[in-house]
Amino acid sequence: MSGADPVLQEGWIDRELALEFPALRIVSVLARNPSPPARTPTVLRERLALLADRFSGARAVTLRREPVPAAYRAFFRHVGLDPDAQRTPVEAAALDRLVHGGFVSRGPLQDALLVAVVETGVPVWAVDDARLDGPLGLRGARAGERLGEGEYAADLAPGRVLVADAAGPVAILFGEVAPDRRPDRHRRALRLFAVAVPGVPALHVEEALFGCADALSDADGPR
């Protein structure tokens, strides 16, 4: 990416969550969505191939004991998620690599998100910045809330930890993004966000977000 790194925006944390997890953060940056019909650039496909070579079967087995994956596994348990049933994003990526014999390219946005989590252990999500109402934050779901709009919107269990803005739920923590907040391939402004759990260095979070934004910028260049 040319020029300075994008500006990090610190999100808000609900008081109850902040008291329970003082080091919990949600951080985001603005990025550009590649113009359709953008394809994953050669440099990004080559990075995926190199990363796949590093994720052998032995690495996948020991991955959970590395500091950053271990921190996410511990946090999963603290918020009621079983990391052996719902794998942390980096472990899910490692398993996908073993199943397919490599990292499968799924387009510039998904590939940039994949590179971020594989290189740093920190998962990054993307939402349509134009559909947000104010900064992102973390809070528990309220009674009667749903993920998205319309009759098919999923009901949310009260207390489940969410990524939210002033208008309501944006995504389930470490899970699905609301359909009405997902990136639109015809809109250029993306909001990339990462959730930093206790034990994850701030540098890893910044590298994940900046690296993802940089990869997306490359996707608008030569293929």
PLM region spans:
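Charge-biased, low-complexity intrinsically disordered regions
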Residues: M1-R223
